[in-house]
Amino acid sequence: MNYKIVSIPGDGIGTEVVAGAVAVLRQLEKKYGFTVEIEEHLFGGASYDVHGEMLTDATLEACKNCDAVLLGAVGGPKWENLPHEHKPEAALLKIRKELGLFANLRPAKVYDALVDASSLKADVVRGTDFVVFRELTGGIYFGQPRGYDENKGWNTMVYEKYEVERIARLAFEAARQRQGRVMSIDKANVLEVSQLWRNVVHAVHADYQDVELSDMYVDNAAMQIVRNPKQFDVIVTGNLFGDILSDISGMITGSLGMLPSASIGSKHALYEPIHGSAPDIAGQNKANPIATIASVAMMFEHSFKRTDIARDIEQAIEAALATGVRTADIAAAGDTAVSTTAMTEAIISQLK
C-alpha cells in the first residue's frame, strides 16, 4: 500500500515537530511494509518570505492531489503587521475552504502518566478519552447578513440541513469505532437553528441505531466537561459551540503540546497540532512533538482507515510517557526535560 502525504511544516516550531512526525512515519513504513511518499511545501510565513504569498498555487494543488496533508504551525510576530488578507491565518482559512474541509475533530485524551499535569484533579480526569466534532463551514461565523454600525451589531446563525447531516454522519461513524456513544450539543431551548440541528441529528441517527444518541444544552456541556469529562465519547456540535467547547476540552489534558486535530471534508483532510508556532522556543529542539505525532495517528484512523496503526501510535506515545520522558511543557518540578528529538526517539523505540 502506498500513501501520498503533503507535508507543510510552516513556521516556528512547525519544522521541528513535523520532522518528528515524519520520523515516526518512516518507522511505520518499516514495521508495516507500506510506502509513504512525502512531498514538502512551504506555507505561511515561510512561504511569504520566499514567494511573497502565504499559500502558493503549487502548494494548494499539491494538497488537492494527495491522500492527506500534515501541517505543523503557522504565523509569528514577523508577519503580524501584514494586511489581514496576507496574514498566515487567512491562508489557513483559504486552504480549508479550497479543500472543502467541513468538520474539525479535536480529541481530548488524558494519558495515565500525565494525570497530574491537568488543571483538574487526577481522579476527575483519569480515563478521559473523547473527541469533539465541530462543524467548520456554517453557523454564525459565516451567516449573512452580518455587520455593525455605531449603534448596533448583527450576525446571523444559519445551518442548512445538509451541513448538519454530513457532520452527524461522521460523528456516528466515529462512535462505531469507539464506545458507541454520541452527545449532540445545541441550545434548542432558545435557538430555532438549534431546533433544526437537533431534528436533523435525530433523523440521521435512524441509520445508526447501534449508536447511543443523547442531547445536551451547550451551557450544561461546558459545566459537564469540567465536572465529569469521562462521561463523553463523541461530541458533535456547531461551529460556535464547538470552537468554545474544544478549547475547554483541550485544557483538560494539561498541555496544548499534547493535542492533535483533523479537518475533514468529503475528499480531503488536513491534520495538525492545535498549538501555535511558539517562536520563543523555535529552533531550540524544545518543542513537544506529541500533538503532531498524534495527528498522524488521526490520519491513519480517518484518512487511511487503519485504526490498528492509529492505536499502535497512541499506545507508543503512552508507553513512552510511562518511561518518564517529558518535554519542558509537561515536565513536573524537578524533572529533567528532554528535547524534541529525544521525545520522538522514545516514541519510535516503542514502535519497533
From Swiss-Prot:
Annotated residues for binding of NAD(+): 76-89, 276-288
EC annotation from Swiss-Prot or TrEMBL: 1.1.1.85
Site, as annotated: Important for catalysis: Y141, K187
Family to which the UniProt record says this protein belongs: Belongs to the isocitrate and isopropylmalate dehydrogenases family. LeuB type 1 subfamily.
Binding site for substrate: R96, R106, R134, D219
Cofactor binding comment, as recorded: Binds 1 Mg(2+) or Mn(2+) ion per subunit.
The protein's name in its UniProt record: 3-isopropylmalate dehydrogenase
The organism's taxonomic lineage, starting at the top: Bacteria, Pseudomonadati, Chlorobiota, Chlorobiia, Chlorobiales
Keywords on record: Amino-acid biosynthesis, Branched-chain amino acid biosynthesis, Cytoplasm, Leucine biosynthesis, Magnesium, Manganese, Metal-binding, NAD, Oxidoreductase
Source domain of life: Bacteria
Role description: Catalyzes the oxidation of 3-carboxy-2-hydroxy-4-methylpentanoate (3-isopropylmalate) to 3-carboxy-4-methyl-2-oxopentanoate. The product decarboxylates to 4-methyl-2 oxopentanoate.
Annotated localization: Cytoplasm
Species of provenance: Chlorobium chlorochromatii (strain CaD3)
